[in-house]
């Protein structure tokens, strides 16, 4: 699903490839996809005040991330926590939050 670009100085997640106006194919960065999604969200709000945008975006990204990591580690929470760089207790709380326990 996600690829990492081959730039050694910065491992950036990509969500696919896009063709530029001049026909060049380049990676589509996850960061850019999130930026577009949030921009579209605000456009749809039509001037209304938005609340809890941080939590909304975090949930949209965090839940599939946890799901993929748990699949990759075959449910091993210690390995998953190490891969994510978080405490195992924190991982357990997040899994419970998204109903993945």
Curated annotation (Swiss-Prot):
<dbReference type="InterPro" id="IPR002197">
    <property type="entry name" value="HTH_Fis"/>
</dbReference>
<feature type="DNA-binding region" description="H-T-H motif">
    <location>
        <begin position="77"/>
        <end position="96"/>
    </location>
</feature>
<dbReference type="InterPro" id="IPR005412">
    <property type="entry name" value="Fis_DNA-bd"/>
</dbReference>
<keyword id="KW-0010">Activator</keyword>
<keyword id="KW-0805">Transcription regulation</keyword>
<keyword id="KW-0804">Transcription</keyword>
<comment type="similarity">
    <text>Belongs to the transcriptional regulatory Fis family.</text>
</comment>
<dbReference type="Pfam" id="PF02954">
    <property type="entry name" value="HTH_8"/>
</dbReference>
<dbReference type="GO" id="GO:0003700">
    <property type="term" value="F:DNA-binding transcription factor activity"/>
</dbReference>
<comment type="subunit">
    <text>Homodimer.</text>
</comment>
<dbReference type="InterPro" id="IPR050207">
    <property type="entry name" value="Trans_regulatory_Fis"/>
</dbReference>
<dbReference type="InterPro" id="IPR009057">
    <property type="entry name" value="Homeodomain-like_sf"/>
</dbReference>
<protein>
    <recommendedName>
        <fullName>DNA-binding protein Fis</fullName>
    </recommendedName>
</protein>
<dbReference type="GO" id="GO:0043565">
    <property type="term" value="F:sequence-specific DNA binding"/>
</dbReference>
<keyword id="KW-0238">DNA-binding</keyword>
<comment type="function">
    <text>Activates ribosomal RNA transcription. Plays a direct role in upstream activation of rRNA promoters.</text>
</comment>
